[in-house]
């Protein structure tokens, strides 16, 4: 079994890459693929680049060239749901776009025409994650949260951005810039997927400073959770 793991930035894949005993590196269209093993599993680790187009391009190349049986997305996110703290981990059971509006043609806000309104994380992987992280976070100051993640081609930090997202997605937990695009490609290739992100900022006016300060913590939390999950697959 080959497992595809995707992170947008070097910081989000570095820890995982450093656990690989040997690596074959392939670069296609600016997307960087690292082929090797993590936790005894065959993996293709992708550094896709930031944003929906880069994520979709990289995921398509991953699916077409390397034929993964599972896709997992790692990285950081802005916590917009109540009670979230920096370092918490969000496991997405649903994803949607926060900046797609074709409602004039009868689609739900956030829905790309002829695509589902929400992309569902794989039920089997979600169940595995729930079991693992309940034990992993039992004695931690951080926690794992399950819920809706919204993807925008914008860094979310302003009140007006919050208002739009909450108007259409009142149960949103976190925001970021790639996951729904990854989920859409996985859906179109019929590949089970799971999105695991750690909170690097609270998507507020201090978000830029918080992101710069805590991106490595978020990347570490997310990577550790993925390694623990790989051990069970």
Curated annotation (Swiss-Prot):
GO terms for molecular function: adenosylhomocysteine nucleosidase activity; methylthioadenosine nucleosidase activity. GO terms for biological process: L-methionine salvage from methylthioadenosine; L-methionine salvage from S-adenosylmethionine; nucleoside catabolic process. Gene3D superfamilies: Nucleoside phosphorylase domain. It catalyses: S-adenosyl-L-homocysteine + H2O = S-(5-deoxy-D-ribos-5-yl)-L-homocysteine + adenine; S-methyl-5'-thioadenosine + H2O = 5-(methylsulfanyl)-D-ribose + adenine; 5'-deoxyadenosine + H2O = 5-deoxy-D-ribose + adenine. The keyword Amino-acid biosynthesis applies. Substrate binds at residues 78, 156, 177-178. One of its GO terms (cellular component) is cytosol. InterPro entries: MTA_SAH_Nsdase, Nucleoside_phosphorylase_d, Nucleoside_phosphorylase_sf. It holds the Pfam family PNP_UDP_1. SUPFAM superfamilies: Purine and uridine phosphorylases (SSF53167). Catalyzes the irreversible cleavage of the glycosidic bond in both 5'-methylthioadenosine (MTA) and S-adenosylhomocysteine (SAH/AdoHcy) to adenine and the corresponding thioribose, 5'-methylthioribose and S-ribosylhomocysteine, respectively. Also cleaves 5'-deoxyadenosine, a toxic by-product of radical S-adenosylmethionine (SAM) enzymes, into 5-deoxyribose and adenine. Belongs to the PNP/UDP phosphorylase family. MtnN subfamily. HAMAP family: Salvage_MtnN (MF_01684). This is 5'-methylthioadenosine/S-adenosylhomocysteine nucleosidase. It comes from Listeria innocua serovar 6a (strain ATCC BAA-680 / CLIP 11262).
């Amino acid at each position: 079994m080959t497992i595809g793991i995707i992170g947008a930035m070097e910081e989000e894949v570095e820890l995982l890459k450093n656990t690989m005993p040997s690596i074959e590196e392939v670069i296609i269209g600016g997307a960087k693929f690292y082929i090797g093993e993590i936790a005894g599993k065959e993996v293709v680790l992708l550094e896709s680049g930031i944003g929906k187009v880069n994520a979709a391009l990289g995921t398509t190349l991953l699916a077409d060239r390397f034929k993964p049986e599972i896709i997992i997305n790692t990285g950081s996110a802005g916590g917009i749901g109540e009670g979230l703290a920096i370092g918490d981990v969000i496991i997405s059971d649903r994803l949607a776009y926060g900046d797609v509006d074709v409602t004039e043609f009868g689609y739900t806000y956030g829905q790309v025409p002829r695509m589902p309104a929400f992309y569902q994380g794989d039920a089997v992987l979600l169940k595995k994650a729930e079991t693992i992280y309940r034990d992993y976070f039992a004695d931690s100051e951080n926690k794992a949260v399950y819920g809706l993640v919204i993807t925008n081609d914008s860094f979310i930090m302003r009140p007006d951005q919050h208002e739009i997202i909450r108007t259409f997605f009142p149960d949103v937990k976190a925001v970021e810039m790639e996951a729904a695009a990854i989920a859409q490609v996985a859906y179109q290739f019929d590949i089970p997927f799971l999105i695991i992100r750690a909170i690097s900022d609270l998507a507020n006016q201090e978000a830029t400073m918080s992101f710069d300060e805590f991106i490595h913590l978020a990347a570490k939390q997310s990577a550790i959770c993925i390694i623990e999950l790989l051990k069970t697959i």
